[in-house]
């Protein structure tokens, strides 16, 4: 009997075309390291468990708060060139760099997410 592990869907809010290309390439090139995840680049993060949020884009935090209010099990990750010094959400600063992205708190987020299941 084989078990297929459910991939964790990663969505996005307001990411730039450059961010989307970078992240899609990371998921494609780092399939082994990111095998627990599936990235959905659409602007509809309703099904996502983890949401990458463009902190530099006006209005995305309001969208995130509405989304998180409807489903508090979702985990957000702020991406931006200027990030708050203190944030309840994990942060990833621009410019996005492969090593930083893979070694970011995403693994910790997955652990936290799986512990809550």
Regions found by a protein language model. Give the residues of each.
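Output/docking surface of receiver
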Residues: 57, 74-117
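Acidic, contiguous N-terminal accessory segments
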Residues: 1-9
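Short amphipathic alpha-helical segments, especially helix-boundary/capping motifs
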Residues: 1, 39, 80-81
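A short, well-structured beta->alpha microelement
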Residues: 7, 14-68
């Amino acid at each position: 009997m084989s078990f297929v592990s459910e991939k964790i869907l990663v969505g996005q809010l307001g990411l730039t075309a450059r961010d989307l290309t970078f992240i899609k390439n990371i998921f494609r090139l780092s399939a082994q390291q990111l095998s627990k995840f599936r990235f959905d680049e659409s602007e509809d993060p309703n099904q996502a468990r983890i949401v990458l949020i463009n902190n530099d884009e006006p209005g995305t935090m309001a969208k995130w708060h509405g989304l998180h209010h409807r489903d508090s099990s979702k985990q957000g990750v702020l991406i931006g060139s200027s990030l708050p010094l203190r944030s309840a959400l994990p942060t990833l600063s621009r410019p996005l760099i492969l090593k930083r992205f893979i070694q970011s708190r995403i693994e910790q987020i997955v652990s936290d997410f799986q512990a809550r299941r």
